[in-house]
Structure formats: structure tokens, C-alpha cells
Amino acid sequence: MATTKRVLYVGGLAEEVDDKVLHAAFIPFGDITDIQIPLDYETEKHRGFAFVEFELAEDAAAAIDNMNESELFGRTIRVNLAKPMRIKEGSSRPVWSDDDWLKKFSGKTLEENKEEEGSEPPKVETQEGEPAVKKARSNPQVYMDIKIGNKPAGRIQMLLRSDVVPMTAENFRCLCTHEKGFGFKGSSFHRIIPQFMCQGGDFTNHNGTGGKSIYGKKFDDENFILKHTGPGLLSMANSGPNTNGSQFFLTCDKTDWLDGKHVVFGEITDGLDVLRQIEAQGSKDGKPKQKVIISDCGEYV
């Protein structure tokens, strides 16, 4: 059946994971038609695994490629195609409600989860409606050394949310490391508006008309799961829907009117004071008072 190519088994789930968390983690890969998290009716807790059904088989395949062996709430999860047993013709009961099926295909996960009991997974606070941040080793961390005029201003350290927007995060990471032969080093923040944002990333024309992504000229909006909830968030600048390149901006304040229009893909973890120094060089029309240069950039490995 074609359905089997669209239903994924997700094992190794932490106790805190629910259908909302799973939906947020898997929706970047395509439309989801159903999420099932089987319960242990004695404990009234889930059994450590779930089933996610995509509308398209290719989206399910993309989810496996990106999510298998990734981390969610401090645990490494396994993601692969579900292997349903044959059930009686005409039955509308999902195969994963059958105890024999569960014993056959979920036993390993249940045992592993029992072994891990006693070591509580770290609690992660998130903005309402946003997925939890994975451990720092799963999400890349990058930095930019900033120079204002001729003086060093300090370093901005950023966490990239590859758990939510892997394509957008990878583009930015590569532009920080220059591993594709081009990137941000030596480019400027060409547009700075106090109490709004600081925009940079045009390393070709240096005025907001250029730049390019590692995928070619432009790439599509990946998703709008993360929101512009406050200062220090990293988001893609664009010239309309699906026109992402290399230009980005750092928010100086909450900018929720940009939600659904610009892809948020990271946040400052250290160096918010440096962002405030950049912001101080701005003006109402966006023209910087002094040159603000990315003198160096790279990835923490």
C-alpha cells in the first residue's frame, strides 16, 4: 500500500513530547495528515514512540533523512518507515493499536527508554507554540566579529535552528565558514534602523541589492514556525515570498508584523551588547553613521 511509504515510526521519545511538539518538528518537511502517540493505559503516559503520517511519500522520505538520529528533548530519536502488519479486511483500527504489533516493532525503544529512566531530560523553556531547542551540539553555533569604524566592537555568537529550518540554517552556517568559497567576511551592515533591526549579508554589492545563497541565487521560504518575539533574533531579509539569498537581519525589538513573511532561523546567545552598539549607528532612513563591518566569522566546532 502507498500509505506505508507515508507513515513514519518515531522512536525514543522523551516523556515531555506530545503531538504538538512532533507536529512542530516534522511540519517543515511537508503536510502532515495524522499523528498517533500510543498510550500505556495503566500509566496514562505514552509508550516512547509515535507515528507521523505525511500527505506525500517524498515528504516522509525527507523527514527520515533529516530527523533520524537527531535529538528531541535531550534524546536521540529514530525515524524510519512504519512496518504495519496485515489486518483483517474492512478493519478501520490502526495497526499500532494492536498489542502484538507494538511488541514486535516497539520493544527495543521501550527497553531503551526504561534504561534511561532516573536521568531526567533537561527542561527546556520555549516561546508558546515554538518547538524546543535541541542541545547546542545538534544546532550549529556561529560567530561574527564586528568592527565599527576602525575599532573592534566585539563578537556576536548565534545559535542556528537547524532543528526547525535546516536548509536556511545551513545556508547561513556555510556563509559564515566560507566553505563554499564566498560569504560574510568583510561585508557590512548596510541598513540599520534603531528599535527595529540591523540588516547585512550583501557581500556582492554591499548596498542591499546583491548577495547569493549557497543553493544558487534565491531559495524558497522554508517555514514560518519561529516568530519575531523580541531582540536578538536572526531572520532572513527578502524582496517578497521565496526570495531568500544571503541577506539577513538581527531584530532590535519585537517585530511580530514580520511573522509569516520572513523566516526566523536563529538567535543571539552572546553579544547582545554588540548588537546594541550596531543599533546605535543607525538612523531613521537606515543609513549607518559609521561603517559596521563583519571583520571575521565562522563556526564553533
Swiss-Prot record:
EC number: 5.2.1.8
SMART domains hit by this protein: RRM (SM00360)
Any one Gene Ontology cellular component term annotated for this protein: intracellular membrane-bounded organelle
Location(s), subcellular: Nucleus
Entry's Gene Ontology BP terms: mRNA splicing, via spliceosome; protein folding
EC supergroup of this enzyme: isomerase
Xref: PROSITE patterns: CSA_PPIASE_1, CSA_PPIASE_2, RRM
Residue numbers bearing the Phosphoserine modification: S91, S97, S119
Domain RRM as annotated: residue spans: 5-83
Keywords: Isomerase, mRNA processing, mRNA splicing, Nucleus, Phosphoprotein, RNA-binding, Rotamase, Spliceosome
Tagged with keyword Isomerase: yes
Keyword Chloroplast: no
Span of domain PPIase cyclophilin-type: 143-299
Entry-linked InterPro entries: Cyclophilin-like_dom_sf, Cyclophilin-type_PPIase_CS, Cyclophilin-type_PPIase_dom, Nucleotide-bd_a/b_plait_sf, PPIE, PPIE_RRM, RBD_domain_sf, RRM_dom
Family: Belongs to the cyclophilin-type PPIase family. PPIase E subfamily.
UniProt function note: Involved in pre-mRNA splicing as component of the spliceosome. Combines RNA-binding and PPIase activities. Binds mRNA and has a preference for single-stranded RNA molecules with poly-A and poly-U stretches, suggesting it binds to the poly(A)-region in the 3'-UTR of mRNA molecules. Catalyzes the cis-trans isomerization of proline imidic peptide bonds in proteins. Inhibits KMT2A activity; this requires proline isomerase activity.
Assembly notes: Identified in the spliceosome C complex. Component of the XAB2 complex, a multimeric protein complex composed of XAB2, PRPF19, AQR, ZNF830, ISY1, and PPIE. Identified in a pentameric intron-binding (IB) complex composed of AQR, XAB2, ISY1, ZNF830 and PPIE that is incorporated into the spliceosome as a preassembled complex. The IB complex does not contain PRPF19. Interacts (via RNA-binding domain) with KMT2A (via the third PHD-type zinc-finger).
Protein name, UniProt field: Peptidyl-prolyl cis-trans isomerase E
Organism, scientific name: Bos taurus (Bovine)
